[in-house]
Amino acid sequence: MAEITSAKAMARTVRVSPRKSRLILDNIRGKNVADAIAILKFTPNKAAGIIEKVLNSAIANAENNFGLEKANLVVSEAFANEGPTMKRFRPRAKGSASPINKRTSHITVVVAEK
């Protein structure tokens, strides 16, 4: 049986746009977990805080469930898929209305040993 060398964490239906999440995830993909946490800490963005929590969860899964060393971990995969969209309407002039899409994300982070 093969030894497990990666761990995954997900945050589903997070109230942040997938497009904005992907901008942050592109910065940490392939980096050492310590560097990735430092990058997220100093990124002034709502998505960065959420992604930091998911990354810490993936690290905890790797340490507690699979006995991997934190020092050897890198962010092997990081992606944001589109979740359900909440549709709202904003009243406009002359009795019309414009749609507002409140988008959500499913954020996934996978850490693996280098």
UniProtKB/Swiss-Prot annotation:
Pfam families: Ribosomal_L22 (PF00237). It comes from the Bacteria. Gene3D superfamilies: Ribosomal protein L22/L17. GO terms for molecular function: rRNA binding; structural constituent of ribosome. PROSITE patterns: RIBOSOMAL_L22 (PS00464). GO terms for cellular component: cytosolic large ribosomal subunit. CDD domains: Ribosomal_L22 (cd00336). InterPro entries: Ribosomal_uL22, Ribosomal_uL22_bac/chlpt-type, Ribosomal_uL22_bac/org-type, Ribosomal_uL22_CS, Ribosomal_uL22_sf. GO terms for biological process: translation. Keywords: Ribonucleoprotein, Ribosomal protein, RNA-binding, rRNA-binding. This protein binds specifically to 23S rRNA; its binding is stimulated by other ribosomal proteins, e.g. L4, L17, and L20. It is important during the early stages of 50S assembly. It makes multiple contacts with different domains of the 23S rRNA in the assembled 50S subunit and ribosome. The globular domain of the protein is located near the polypeptide exit tunnel on the outside of the subunit, while an extended beta-hairpin is found that lines the wall of the exit tunnel in the center of the 70S ribosome. Part of the 50S ribosomal subunit. Belongs to the universal ribosomal protein uL22 family. PANTHER family: CHLOROPLAST 50S RIBOSOMAL PROTEIN L22-RELATED, LARGE RIBOSOMAL SUBUNIT PROTEIN UL22M. This is Large ribosomal subunit protein uL22.
